[in-house]
Swiss-Prot record:
[3Fe-4S] cluster binds at residues 27, 30, 34. The iodate reductase (Idr) complex is composed of a molybdopterin-dependent iodate reductase (IdrA and IdrB subunits) and two associated peroxidases (IdrP1 and IdrP2). Its EC number is 1.-.-.-. GO terms for cellular component: membrane; oxidoreductase complex; periplasmic space. This is Iodate reductase subunit IdrA. Keywords: 3Fe-4S, Iron, Iron-sulfur, Metal-binding, Molybdenum, Oxidoreductase, Periplasm. It is found in: Periplasm. Belongs to the prokaryotic molybdopterin-containing oxidoreductase family. It comes from Pseudomonas sp. (strain SCT). Residues 431-452 are annotated as: Disordered. Its cofactor is [3Fe-4S] cluster; Mo-bis(molybdopterin guanine dinucleotide). The record marks 105 as: Involved in charge transfer.
């Protein structure tokens, strides 16, 4: 008898008949977004083994690995129009972009298994709206759930103000949904209490790139194919952007410089192939590495001087376009403030004057070999025999900007710029990306109505975590995210949420609408909080323990949706089966609630389908790099729906921003490229400077300095480093290839849930030996000094938001954080550094990370956890090899 969750392999899959429905979509997971085809046909019918008898057009059996075939993980049975249907979801073998020939990752290779099927663990999907009665979630109607929420929301907004009504939301689950959510929160209600899933505030990620004038997703996949050297900071594209790496980066003979404390599979492969250099850096010290590399380049005159002369702003150009007004927004005052701003001459002097840029000093701070640093500088910048510079592209991700947010990303941008990268083929500077780009906001800018201020009383985005910890939120709607596990100081955040919700004496006792209102009114008036949660599955602990109202959400495959990947390629994600039960997409839920709130009097929430939302969003895309307005206008002129016009582009899609040339829609391969031929402006085309130049007033990039001793950084860094006397190690976190985000789908997929049934942490053998830890042991990680920022500190003087001053002013609280996980002991980790699995709700690694934002950006330093490792027993997987492989990841 097999266990309920045990993976049982199958050796057969039904073939789609010739008349099967064929729809296109893209992968729901990583930012690469490989193109897929969905074959759908009624149960009771199958195709034959001959090519003429099946929709795949192939003879079976065959031995073509990259040919047309489906594995058991690519098949499921779903409901379509209330009738059982087979679906096969396979990578598009005819694809010529993104995943040529049908290449894909293990994540995309199991897409079919995410579809709802009551015969497997997807039966755990939320299917009905629910209200928590006597501690138990009870199914109710959509009307009652939204009326209850509207009743208490109207009361809270009227008595406590819109800032007491909060939203914590995904930023990527399709244009239609994100637009609807932001329209409600930022425009209709106008609350500043809003934050994205991965941040405590509605901020940008790699702010240093933004300030330099570089769009985080300026590059195309062909740039990563065409470069001769890839400098990869805080990222292994194989693990997290698999097809970008295997289809576009591995072919050829390009070299790879990996800056990460973890030798993941991509790193190990490149080193073994003689094409890689691994720089196992101490977390948070990338800025010093960048300065040391820049110094070597400058001292040897390897910089791309013609590029610098043409494309780097001088001191006058840095200040151009501002007039006499207050530099109030972040990018304005940061790029015109002497600590960071520079031109080429000033930057050169700065680099040569920094003690930390000296090779021996940098090697000591970063923990790297001086020889390796020198080799990296040669690879990325040393001119060839003919005098030409290597075509180097620079990619950063979370290991870079989520450790020292502003300085790492700013110094990274400057390093790339002096190497002549940023706006030409094969020589780009970009993020690698995490999730796909499904965020288009309705605007409103209410997030700037924050009680906090940057130094000089400049406006600062709203810190939702801090606002909650201070007890200022009376209602919070959590949409598609694991708020607790994803944020810093997770244990303290969870405890505060629990005290405001589940531990309140005011709990719903019946489904009488009036009684519910009185109960929730009493709770909020006594300082408590009401919570609602929209998601696919019950989310620990927000949905399972705290939420008073829970909404079931329809997502990938259950409605027509749109979004872009990391090269801004827009595609339609086709609906191909029925959502379970009464589950509805976010846009529909928002609309239902808005109507109950009386916010639809102008017809602003009267969408009939997702296409209505898509067409409305189009005009809000016009001023950005995701502009698809010309497509919507062309569809309107042709008398068809915009989503249907996009459907015709299949898995190829079209790269935004979209423009018209000769009456045809044309995509944009890369941004900032002066070779982009825009010609005359046609139709609804919007021509912005960032398409042919850098995104600054002058169109030239800004070189940013990054002084290691900047008080806003160094004081925090010294406070949170591992303490040798306590036996602490760095505790960072990251992803592995097989899983996605919090594992919300993976836990319901038989093979993947068996491969990774629980959270895990990679530990170097030296660190494990000291604690008697072996692979398969349960380990508790404890940090007895987790710093939590409190209050709403006002920045007047430059020093006001530095760590020491916050501590002196009583704005830092000290707590303890801990999480339990399973050890994987391997030399793939640098000694003194452990890496826990990212965002596991039952094992939140962020519990040991301090919740003190970067004072320059208001972003957390997610990767800088620390803790003591304590063995607490053996897991059931230590001696049972049917589950959870404990093999290292640097085996290639």
């Amino acid at each position: 008898m097999s266990k309920p969750d045990e993976y049982l392999s199958s050796n057969s899959v039904p073939l789609p008949p010739q008349d099967a429905d064929v729809l296109t979509t893209a992968c729901d997971y990583c930012i690469v977004a490989c193109g897929y085809k969905v074959y759908r046909w009624p149960v009771g019918k199958e195709g034959g083994a001959k090519a003429s008898e099946n929709a795949l057009g192939a003879d079976f059996p065959h031995q073509m690995m990259m040919g047309a075939w489906a594995s058991p993980a690519q098949h499921n049975v779903v409901s379509y129009r209330d009738q059982p249907h087979h679906v096969v979801v396979i990578a598009d073998k005819d694809a010529t972009v993104v995943n040529p020939g049908g290449n894909h990752s293990i994540r995309g290779g199991t897409l079919a298994e995410k579809c709802y099927n009551p015969s497997n663990r997807t039966r755990e999907r939320l299917q009905h709206p629910m209200i928590r009665v006597n501690g138990k979630l009870t199914p109710v109607s959509w009307d009652l759930a939204t009326e209850v929420m509207a009743d208490i929301s109207q009361y809270i907004i009227a008595k406590y103000g819109e800032h007491a009504w909060a939203v914590k939301s995904h930023s990527y689950q399709y244009f239609e949904n994100v637009y609807a959510i932001t329209k409600l929160a930022m425009t209709s209600i106008g609350t500043p209490a809003f934050a994205w899933h991965d941040k405590c505030s509605a901020t940008n990620d790699a702010t240093g790139l933004d300030d330099a004038g570089i769009d985080s997703f300026a590059s195309s996949y062909e740039d990563w194919a065409d470069c001769e050297v890839a400098f990869l900071s805080g990222v292994d594209p194989y693990e997290t952007k698999t097809t970008l790496f295997t289809s576009h980066m591995m072919p050829g003979d390009k070299k790879f410089v990996f800056v990460t404390p973890h030798m993941t599979m991509g790193v190990a492969w490149s080193v073994k192939a003689g094409r890689g250099l691994w720089l196992p850096i101490i977390p948070g010290t990338d800025t010093v590495l960048h300065m040391a590399l820049a110094r070597i380049i400058i001292e040897n005159d390897w910089q791309d001087q013609p590029f610098i002369d043409k494309w780097i702003a001088n001191s006058w150009e840095v200040d151009s376009g501002y007039g006499r007004g207050t530099r109030n927004t972040g990018w304005q005052w940061r790029t015109t403030w002497g600590t960071w701003q520079s031109d080429w001459q000033d930057y050169r002097k700065f680099i040569l004057a920094q003690e930390e840029s000296k090779l021996d000093v940098a090697a000591q701070i970063t923990g790297l070999s001086a020889d390796d640093i020198r080799t990296a500088a040669e690879w990325i910048a040393k001119p060839k025999a003919d005098g030409s510079h290597p075509k180097t592209s620079f990619m950063c991700e979370k290991g870079n900007y989520w450790s020292n947010n502003y300085m790492n990303s700013a110094s990274f941008a400057s390093l790339g710029l002096i190497c002549g990268s940023g706006n030409r083929k094969g020589r780009m500077i970009s993020r690698g990306g995490g999730h796909q780009r499904g965020g288009l906001s309705a605007g409103g800018n209410s997030e700037w109505l924050s009680p906090e201020k940057y130094p000089g009383r400049r406006k600062k985005s709203f810190n939702l975590d801090l606002w909650l910890m201070e007890g200022n939120i009376r209602f919070a709607w959590v949409i598609g995210t694991t708020w607790v596990a994803a944020m810093m100081g997770s244990n303290a955040l969870e405890a505060k949420m629990r005290s405001l919700t589940a531990e309140s004496p005011h709990q719903i006792k019946s489904l009488d609408r009036a009684a519910i209102f009185e109960t929730l009114k009493a709770r909020v008036d006594s300082g408590g909080m009401v919570m609602a949660n929209s998601d696919l599955y019950p989310v620990v602990p927000v949905g399972t323990d705290f939420a008073d109202i829970v909404y079931p959400v329809a997502s990938w495959g259950e409605d027509n949706f749109t979004r872009c990947n990391s090269e801004r390629r827009l595609r339609l994600y086709s609906k191909f089966y029925d959502a379970p039960g009464e589950a509805k997409p976010d846009w529909w839920i928002v609309q239902k609630f808005a109507q109950k709130m009386g916010l639809d009097k102008d017809g602003g929430y009267s969408w009939k389908d997702s296409n209505d939302v898509f067409e409305e969003v189009a005009r809000f895309s016009r001023d950005g790099v995701l502009n698809y307005h010309p497509l919507a206008e062309k569809a309107k002129a042709s008398g068809i729906k915009a989503q249907e016009l996009l459907r015709g582009y299949g898995t190829t899609g079209i790269q935004t921003p979209i423009r018209e040339r000769g009456g045809e829609l044309v995509g944009t391969v890369r941004l900032h490229d002066p070779d982009n031929d825009w010609g005359e402006i046609e139709g609804s085309t919007v021509h912005t400077k960032a398409l042919v130049a850098f995104n600054t007033h002058s169109g030239k990039a800004i070189l940013l300095k990054s002084p290691w001793q900047y008080a806003g950084w160094i004081q925090f860094y010294e406070a949170i480093k591992p303490r040798a006397a306590k036996g602490e190690v760095w505790v960072t976190n990251g992803r592995v290839n097989e899983t996605w985000q919090s594992g919300f789908d993976d836990r319901r997929k038989p093979y993947l849930s068996q491969r990774w049934p629980e959270g895990f942490i990679f530990i170097n053998p030296e660190d494990a030996r000291k604690k008697g830890i072996e692979s398969g042991d349960y380990v508790e990680v404890v940090n007895d000094t987790v710093y939590i920022q409190t209050g709403q500190p006002q920045g007047v003087l430059d020093a006001d938001l530095t760590f020491n001053q916050l501590m002196a002013d009583g704005h830092i609280k000290i707590t303890t954080g801990r999480f339990k996980t399973i050890a994987v002991v391997s030399d793939e980790m640098r000694p003194g550094v452990c890496q826990a699995n990212f965002n596991v709700p039952s094992s939140p690694a962020n519990a040991v990370v301090s919740a003190v934002p970067d004072p320059m950006t208001n972003n957390y330093r997610y990767k800088l956890g620390r803790g003591v490792l304590n063995k607490v027993g053996e897991s059931p997987y230590k001696h049972n090899f049917t589950q959870m492989s404990l093999k290292p990841r640097n085996i290639v």
